[in-house]
């Protein structure tokens, strides 16, 4: 290599280094975009503007200094700020809003422990496929990794839990980052997204400038370099911050079945004599209205088993809704349509499916679509697409065709026999206190037609799932496949805000109540009255039922018959203690609770219950 070539390469490398450094330091951007040093505006306003343009009505939070600008700006734009007593509750409330409103639920929490407190709730949203945006505060951009207050590697925590994670580095990035996150949350298989906002991207220039002002910097050349670097960093942070940007929602991508796939399924369904449909929560996702799905199912005339958020889709007493004997029905079925239903533990990993049956599986998520298909079952047709729109297209293509009526009738007859047997168990006297099945039947009979039921617990809630009947679509909220305890307070809060005229019930076990009983304070402060039905048997019964006979000890399963109703009173609600001596007045107490709830009081019914064998053999691991 001659000297001229060597010099040319060296100059090229040097020039490339200068250009790269200029880009990283924002020098090139600053040449063309102004830094408005006198502007009182702050990054929280940009966040609020994007949220408003996307139809966000609520932001759930537990306040912290890192995120205060976002909360203040949202309030000024008419977005309601709802503060809870635990960060997990804020995320659960956002999850409920996402499920019931068809939009993205939003929670904002402070840095460090504020964010770590949300991990379980975010994982629950991921597994329940709920589109929500988690906003987290963070240490200032220059202080991350340097031991700042509440500074941890938050991105590593949330990358496994979220579809999209971003850390905003300049104020100008806020709008495009939030727009992108909201679109990703709703696209494909919905799920949570996370954006980290360093504190210096949220406060006004003059506030951040004070923090960046050089203090005790070295003298001489090094001091000048540090001062220049800090000044440039600040300028780049705010360069182009307040330029006009598009705030509108980005397109949302939803996968759909192809015409050929629908046609193949039409042929299979038209030949079936004993088809069944298993609907999961995915069947209720936007954009297909739940009422349209109901009409499609009624047109098909195929018996349906409803799970998760699809409970209530067919109303209270549909002849097509089969609630009992699912295993037997699947054994006899010659065609099974899994509409958003997954072959996990809830279907014994696919082992309950008849190998001779034709199986149509529809799911937005490929991994869920084919889960355990390598071992226990094989789909005849597997469609990675939206279950709701698929059912509509299938119904239209099969117009005029209905399932043979004797098949759903026979399943309904078996259903009625099992329901009668279950009712007989409710009439049995327990050794002490009230029969929980009887209590649940009484409540179910008195539920308002617009009621929303929130399920949070193990044994008592498991019984409620058999007995209590949601009156309509999107009227049942449970955690989903993760089986998380502690969703009750947040789910009920979100549900009541979405549907303020509806009667919202939380069905609690006495164990699960302990997670969110403090949210009675939230219900009172934010005027979101709900009714909590607590099955109090002083035990973690879901675990105790198997632990005692298998291992011979009730260790860690025992609780006390605690006065939870007094706690509700202390938080500004109204509590009732209900024991066996109150059995004859139970209906009157329930009606009184409903009346007080309508008048604005959150109510807790602390019902002392005894033991039954109704759920022997139920899954706890």
UniProtKB/Swiss-Prot annotation:
Q: What is its EC number?
A: 4.1.2.-
Q: Residues that bind thiamine diphosphate, according to the entry?
A: 87
Task: Name the residues that bind Mg(2+).
Answer: 510, 536
Q: How is the cofactor bound?
A: Binds 1 Mg(2+) ion per subunit.
InterPro entries assigned? DHS-like_NAD/FAD-binding_dom (IPR029035), THDP-binding (IPR029061), Thiamin_PyroP_enz_cen_dom (IPR012000), Thiamin_PyroP_enz_TPP-bd_dom (IPR012001), TPP-bd_CS (IPR000399), TPP_enz (IPR045229), TPP_enzyme_TPP-bd (IPR011766)
Molecular function terms, GO-annotated: acetolactate synthase activity; flavin adenine dinucleotide binding; lyase activity; magnesium ion binding; thiamine pyrophosphate binding
Check the record and name the Gene3D superfamilies matching this protein. 3.40.50.970, TPP-binding domain (3.40.50.1220)
Keywords annotated in UniProt: Endoplasmic reticulum, Fatty acid metabolism, Lipid metabolism, Lyase, Magnesium, Membrane, Metal-binding, Thiamine pyrophosphate, Transmembrane, Transmembrane helix
Q: Which family does it belong to?
A: Belongs to the TPP enzyme family.
User: What is the protein name for this chain?
Assistant: 2-hydroxyacyl-CoA lyase 2
Whichever gene encodes this chain, its name is ilvbl
């Amino acid at each position: 290599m001659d000297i001229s070539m060597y010099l040319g390469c060296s100059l090229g490398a040097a020039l490339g280094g200068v250009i790269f450094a200029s880009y990283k330091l924002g020098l090139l951007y600053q040449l063309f975009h102004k830094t408005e040093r006198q502007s009182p505006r702050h990054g929280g306003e940009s966040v609020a503007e994007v949220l408003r343009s996307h139809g966000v009505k609520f932001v759930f939070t537990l306040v912290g200094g890192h995120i205060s600008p976002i909360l203040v700006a949202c309030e000024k734009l008419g977005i309601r700020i709802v503060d809870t007593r635990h960060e997990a509750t804020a995320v659960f409330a956002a999850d409920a809003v996402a499920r019931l409103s068809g939009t993205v639920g939003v929670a904002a929490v402070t840095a460090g422990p504020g964010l770590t407190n949300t991990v379980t709730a975010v994982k629950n949203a991921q597994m329940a496929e709920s589109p929500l945006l988690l906003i987290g505060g963070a240490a200032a951009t220059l202080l991350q990794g340097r031991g700042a207050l509440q500074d941890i590697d938050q991105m590593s925590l949330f990358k496994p839990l979220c579809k999209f994670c971003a850390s905003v580095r300049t104020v100008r990035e806020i709008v495009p980052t939030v727009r992108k996150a909201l679109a990703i949350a709703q696209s494909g298989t919905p799920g949570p997204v996370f954006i980290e906002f360093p504190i210096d991207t949220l406060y006004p220039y003059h506030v951040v400038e004070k923090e960046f002002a050089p203090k005790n910097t070295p003298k001489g050349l090094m001091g000048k370099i540090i001062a220049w670097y800090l000044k440039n960093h600040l300028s780049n942070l705010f360069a182009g911050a307040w330029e006009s940007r598009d705030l509108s929602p980005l397109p949302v991508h939803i996968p759909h079945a192809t015409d050929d796939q629908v046609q193949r399924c039409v042929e299979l369904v038209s030949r079936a004599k004993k088809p069944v449909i298993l609907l999961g929560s995915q069947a209720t996702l936007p954009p297909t209205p739940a009422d349209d799905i109901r009409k499609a199912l009624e047109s098909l005339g195929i018996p349906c088993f409803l799970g998760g958020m699809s409970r209530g889709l067919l109303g209270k007493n549909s002849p097509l809704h089969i609630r009992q004997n699912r295993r037997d029905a699947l054994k006899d079925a010659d065609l099974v349509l899994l509409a958003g239903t997954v072959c996990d533990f809830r279907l014994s990993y696919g082992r309950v499916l008849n190998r001779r049956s034709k199986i149509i599986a529809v799911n937005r998520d490929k991994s869920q679509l084919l889960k355990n298909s390598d071992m226990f079952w094989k789909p005849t047709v597997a469609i990675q697409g939206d279950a709701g729109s698929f059912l509509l297209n299938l119904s239209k293509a099969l117009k005029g065709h209905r399932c043979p009526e004797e098949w759903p009738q026979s399943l309904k007859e078996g259903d009625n026999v099992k329901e009668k047997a279950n009712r007989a168990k409710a009439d049995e006297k327990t050794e002490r206190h009230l029969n929980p099945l009887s209590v649940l039947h009484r409540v179910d009979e008195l539920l308002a037609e617009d009621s929303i039921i929130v399920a949070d617990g193990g044994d008592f809630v498991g019984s409620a799932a058999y007995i209590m009947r949601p009156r309509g679509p999107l009227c049942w909220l449970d955690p989903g496949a993760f089986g998380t305890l502690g969703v009750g307070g947040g789910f009920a809060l979100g549900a009541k805000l979405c549907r303020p005229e509806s009667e919202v019930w939380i069905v609690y076990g006495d164990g699960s109540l302990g997670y969110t009983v403090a949210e009675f304070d939230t219900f009172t402060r934010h005027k979101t009255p709900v009714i909590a039905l607590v099955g109090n048997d002083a035990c973690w019964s879901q675990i105790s039922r198997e632990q005692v006979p298998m291992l011979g000890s009730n260790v860690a399963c025992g609780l006390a018959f605690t006065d939870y109703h007094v706690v509700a009173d202390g938080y500004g609600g109204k509590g009732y203690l209900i024991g066996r001596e109150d059995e004859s007045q139970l209906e009157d107490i329930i009606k009184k609770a409903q009346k007080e709830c309508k008048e604005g009081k959150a109510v807790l019914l602390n019902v002392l219950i005894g033991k039954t064998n109704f759920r022997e053999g139920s899954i706890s691991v």
